[in-house]
Amino acid sequence: MLERIKDSFTESIQTKIDASEALPESIAKAAEMMVNCLLGGNKILACGNGGSAGDAQHFSAELLNRYEIERPPLPAIALSCDTSTITAIANDYSYDEIFSKQIMALGQPGDILLAISTSGNSGNVIKAMEAALSRDMTIVSLTGKDGGAMAGLLSVNDVEIRVPSNVTARIQEVHLLAIHCLCDNIDRTLFPQDEQA
């Protein structure tokens, strides 16, 4: 059992090393898009299922409250939080529409959708992306494995942050780190600090 625990740490470290080579450019591009979105008076909507829903909430909480520096709140909404809305849509229509209907109501041109799925094949996240595109929003996707069906929906205006791993737990661990990198870049760009302070 101890070896298995050590192996999990080793695998996580190796996945992060691999990601540190593969992902910085796409994370930087996504952060720049998010900064421009926020400077333009727009907002960021985020969605995912299970652990990815938790990641969406984590991201929006960091923007609405703060990440590491004191600053004004920034507009972000996690679409996985309103249980009454989610269950109404799932009951009356289908689970695949729980995010897309919210995007059709809340999304505006210039907004960004942060779409999170370790496999890239979550039906309701794919529908969310389709709704975002119909609302002239841009998309930042956080995926893993081969990017799944989500990869095929992205245009040159969108950004894919695809973790180089096939293991769900390792992908989720890097997703959290990528989210922290996004938040750090957003904060440091919008609210530059004296690095020596």
Curated annotation (Swiss-Prot):
Q: Which GO MF terms are attached to this record?
A: carbohydrate derivative binding; D-sedoheptulose 7-phosphate isomerase activity; zinc ion binding
Matches recorded under SUPFAM superfamilies: SIS domain (SSF53697)
In which pathway is this protein known to take part? Carbohydrate biosynthesis; D-glycero-D-manno-heptose 7-phosphate biosynthesis; D-glycero-alpha-D-manno-heptose 7-phosphate and D-glycero-beta-D-manno-heptose 7-phosphate from sedoheptulose 7-phosphate: step 1/1
Recorded superkingdom: Bacteria
Disulfide bond sites: none
Q: Which cofactor does it need?
A: Zn(2+)
**In the UniProt record, which is one GO cellular component term?**
cytoplasm
Question: Binding residues for Zn(2+), per the UniProt record?
Answer: 58, 62, 172, 180
Residues the entry annotates as binding substrate: 49-51, 62, 91-92, 117-119, 122, 172
Q: Which reaction does it catalyse?
A: 2 D-sedoheptulose 7-phosphate = D-glycero-alpha-D-manno-heptose 7-phosphate + D-glycero-beta-D-manno-heptose 7-phosphate
- Provide a GO biological process annotation: carbohydrate metabolic process
Keyword list (alphabetical) reads: Carbohydrate metabolism, Cytoplasm, Isomerase, Metal-binding, Zinc
**Which Gene3D superfamilies does this one have?**
Glucose-6-phosphate isomerase like protein, domain 1
Q: Does the keyword Metal-binding apply?
A: yes
Q: What does this protein's UniProt record list under function?
A: Catalyzes the isomerization of sedoheptulose 7-phosphate in D-glycero-D-manno-heptose 7-phosphate.
Q: Which family does it belong to?
A: Belongs to the SIS family. GmhA subfamily.
Under the subunit heading, UniProt states: Homotetramer.
Listed name of the protein: Phosphoheptose isomerase
Q: Which organism is it from?
A: Shewanella pealeana (strain ATCC 700345 / ANG-SQ1)
Taxonomic classification, please?
A: Bacteria, Pseudomonadati, Pseudomonadota, Gammaproteobacteria, Alteromonadales
